[in-house]
From Swiss-Prot:
Coiled coil: none annotated. It is found in: Secreted. GO terms for molecular function: copper chaperone activity; iron ion binding; metal chelating activity. This is Antimicrobial peptide microplusin. GO terms for cellular component: extracellular region. Keywords: Antibiotic, Antimicrobial, Copper, Disulfide bond, Fungicide, Immunity, Innate immunity, Metal-binding, Secreted, Signal. Transmembrane segments: none annotated. Disulfide bonds join C26-C72, C39-C100, C61-C66.
Length: 110
């Protein structure tokens, strides 16, 4: 039972941290968003890239920036992303976004 509780706390922490950074991407200008999404594309797995391409198509967009903007517009980015991505894929995108964000504080780059 204790393990389940700890697992649940980890999921909540992951969702909170992922959502916070993804919300930052929602406020980026178009050029910055396109640049970061291209960087993310190069860092995520083929499966996650395929899921992103699927989201673009299902959202009737021509590119990932459009799809991301539409997910941001729902006012619940985490929930919108969960329609197209698994929790693991969302974490992968978050990790790549953090690495690609020129404004992020990269604590591991000492």
């Amino acid at each position: 039972m204790k393990a389940i509780f700890v697992s649940a706390l980890l999921v909540v922490a992951l969702v909170a941290s992922t959502s916070a950074h993804h919300q930052e991407l929602c406020t980026k200008g178009d050029d910055a968003l396109v640049t970061e999404l291209e960087c993310i594309r190069l860092r995520i797995s083929p499966e996650t890239n395929a899921a992103f391409d699927n989201a673009v198509q299902q959202l009737n967009c021509l590119n990932r920036a459009c799809a991301y903007r539409k997910m941001c517009a729902t006012n619940n980015l985490e929930q919108a992303m969960s329609v197209y991505f698994t929790n693991e894929q969302i974490k992968e995108i978050h990790d790549a976004a953090t690495a690609c964000d020129p404004e992020a504080h990269h604590e591991h780059d000492h």
